[in-house]
Amino acid sequence: MPEELDELNKLFTSKNAEDVIKFYDHFDNAEQLIQWMKNRPSAPMKIYEVGGDKDIVVVIPTANHDGEYAKNCADNIFKGQQIVFVESNGPFFNYARSCNFGLKYAFKYKPKWIVLSNDDVEKAGDMSKLKSELVKLDYKNTDIVLLKNSESRPYDLSSVLVYETLLLHAYRKFAGSEMRVYQKLRDKFTLNLDVIGKRRFDKFSSKFLYNKIREFYGFFDFIIVNDEYLKTKHQFFDPNFVNGYEDHFLSYEFSEQHRHISIIDFEISSVGGYTLGSGYMRRLKEIAPLIYFNYLLKNGERKL
């Protein structure tokens, strides 16, 4: 691996905000950073399986197949189903690539449905309930299955692609030193497209901060995919995203391609992934995948 590539990755994966800022300072424009993302190697990935019913195969990316979260998935949450754990960790972990690797492997079982889930699921409805809900669907006319919003899933089912207004940019510049740095980076890479939840967008104040471009269904830690739909895709997620916005971009693709999405009633809750950290650090590290997200939409890769 080139020494510069390794050094840049150390800065990007650092837990020190100043290091992450130095990482962004290295690049003059979005194209340079995107090239770094494309050249970034993948962490090793290894498959571990738990045998079970193969009509629904569950694919779970995890840092430790023998850890507390993974064991809970195998022994409780998805007990009785064929489970494919994709173990991958370290500084070059890439969520999108781990998911793609596991989904491709799951095809060997020729399942009707493939569940893609995070490993930090805390509780879920009985698998028999999930199966009964899926039986009700028109299989041939259902590409994607999402879960109905509930108390255990309080986030928005609908997402909104927005164009940020100058008022929001100005607000960030006066909202404290961290937000000023954050907005400075967004200005540097011309990041004015983003995705927010519909409930947040519907707030009165948001009307002055964002211009709505398109509303679409989003998914977060759990999605069910028809195997016939998966056969039409070379890769489920775009592997160039680095642990962020790959789900938003795919959700946007579903909308653009008019994919058939069904919503079922099934309870599930999770801790919530923090691959990029939380708070200010998370916002800083999400800039990289947001740069790629903006690039794809602005350069004719996808229609707005």
Language model segments and positions:
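Glycine-rich, basic loop-to-helix element that forms the pyrophosphate-binding segment
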Residues: 90-106
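Short, acidic/glycine-rich phosphate-metal binding loop used to engage nucleotide
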Residues: 64, 88-95, 151
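Short beta-strand-to-loop acidic/aromatic patch adjacent to the donor-nucleotide binding site
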Residues: 111-122
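Acidic donor-diphosphate engagement hotspot in glycosyltransferases and nucleotidyltransferases
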Residues: 99, 125-129
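Short, acidic, metal-binding catalytic loop of nucleotide-sugar glycosyltransferases
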Residues: 48-53, 72-85
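C-terminal catalytic/acceptor-binding lobe
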Residues: 2-51, 212, 217-219, 239-304
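A conserved hydrophobic helix/loop-capping motif in glycosyltransferases and polysaccharide synthases
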Residues: 51-52, 56-66, 147
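Conserved catalytic core of nucleotide-sugar-dependent glycosyltransferases
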Residues: 130-233
